[in-house]
Amino acid sequence: MTAPANGPLRIAMISYYLPSGSKIGVGYQVHELATELVRRGHHVDVFSDCPPVDGAIYGHRHIASSGSLRTFRFALALRRVDFGSYDVLHAHGDDYWLWRRRVARHIRTVHGSCFEEALRIPGLREKLRMTLLGFSELLASVVADETVVVSPVTRRWMPWVKRIIPNGVDSLRFHPDATQRANDPTILFVGTWENRKRGKDLAAAFERDVVPLVERARLEMVCRDAPDTPGPGIHILGNLNDAELSAAYQRAWAFCLPSDYEGFGIPYAEAMSSGVPVVSTPNVGARYVTDNGAAGLLTPLGKIGTSLTQLLLDPLERERLREAGLKRAALFDLRTVVDSYELLYRAND
């Protein structure tokens, strides 16, 4: 089946996560996509376990789940929803039970691989949960009319999926402004102190390698789980709104997110769109977003502090990476991404 060839569409989006209840990047991407689609005249309702996002211009349908294994309960609850009034069902997770819950077009976006996360996440119980979610992703790719991955590497786990549409960044919000750059050499981190984002490891590398060699160096960390005294020169910014986050990027001399795993890595694209050189460990998302290091600096975790020090002291290299990053970031412009989805919504099977 196909959605109407012309006119506004009625779109149901599924996302367990939204910015109102989670820091998971998928929720932020869904919020951005839904907002842009509404601006283009479409009707969008997001079905989520999270509460509505303050100020959101799209509709919200709360699918409550509780107890253990909440994501699995959420997926089962979706099977009781009648999506028949929509032209498009666009799922960003948890649609693997939705066979025969027909709409004109059922699209699934896979934002990364839970199998990849299962290889890295600590704890046997979490490894098992991620493995089960990985199998649910495989099932969902069969249930949907068409499945999309956000980076080529994700196809490792589902090679039958051919279409790639990257995540999108709002270039009207994340853009360069040289007048806002900090006077002091400033590194920005967006993530979590613990686990795979490895903020704690970045802070240790900053204190060990950067502070002794770069005068007045600062590390600004957008995270909520850092200790009260993270170390000299380290400033915890907590949770920022959109305008504050954009300003933080514009202040930065360099951006660093040394994750063990990213399915895509939206903060890399936000930094590049803001004209900020990117430094990262060579996780699969960073390799894709930076074009295998052509538009960013990829280095092992043990050398991350040394690489940041060299970059802060080398204005020519910062300018080279800034220009390369801006050029690469055009691929991830939100409007280009939504153009691709609009075509997919109306495509023939």
Model-derived segments and their meaning:
Residues 88-90, 100-120, 148:
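Active-site proximal beta-strand in glycosyltransferases
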Residues 127-147:
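Membrane-proximal helix-turn-helix segments that form the acceptor-binding/catalytic region
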Residues 153, 168:
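Carbohydrate-associated surface elements
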Residues 178-197, 203-207, 220:
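Conserved donor-binding/catalytic core segment of Leloir-type glycosyltransferases
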Residues 238-239, 291-303, 310-316:
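Conserved acidic donor-binding segment of nucleotide-sugar-dependent glycosyltransferases
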Residues 240, 247-252, 341:
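Short alpha-helical donor nucleotide-sugar binding micro-motif in glycosyltransferases
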Residues 260:
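Aromatic "clamp/platform" in nucleotide-sugar-dependent glycosyltransferases that forms part
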Residues 277-280:
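Short hydrophobic beta-strand element within catalytic cores of glycosyltransferases
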